Amino acid sequence: MGRIVDFNDKVFYKYHKMEIVNTIIREYKEADDARRKELIDNVAVAFNINTIAIYDRTELTKHILYGDQRMTDDDGSFFKEDNYIPNFREDGIFVIDNINYFETKAPAVYKVYSEYGIVQAVQYIIGGDIKKNNNIISYGRYKLDKKWAESDMNFLAIIGDYIGRVFLKERKHD
């Protein structure tokens, strides 16, 4: 007889998050608006996220995918200030574990995010290369949580890259 495996919470949530990534990739592009909303909601819950937004830095627009709709007045112009973009890692990921650290390092980002109550964020350059793409997806939290796990950052980058490419491609065709 087989032995029942006792997964601890950490292992369970890691595999649960992988399933969310897989589901996004399998379903998002062909899904209707209601299903897309459900998929985005699943991402937010699994990763303890309060806001998800795509910044189109070419058009200086922000598209809220999840969270507070009043945040649309932020156009992402803060990305051009404080020499912010070079802080992204080579893989296109940038992590804010505590927004207070940026009060002097990147005051424009600090001002925008603190006004909305965002204290932690993971940002990803859609496509992974700032030289080829001006679009960024940002995931924000309103409460300080533990530091972002490396696996979570990578999962969010994969999700953000896929959703971002689909979203922006569809906007260009509208």
Residue ranges and their predicted role:
Residues M1-A34, K172-D174:
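Signal-transmission linkers at sensory-effector interfaces
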Residues D41-A44, A53-S77, I85:
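GAF sensory/regulatory domain recognition
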Residues K147-L168:
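Amphipathic alpha-helical "output/dimerization" segments
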Residues D73-V122:
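Regulatory sensory and allosteric helical modules in signal-transduction proteins
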Residues T51, T58, F167-R171:
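Long, hydrophobic, amphipathic alpha-helical segments used as structural scaffolds
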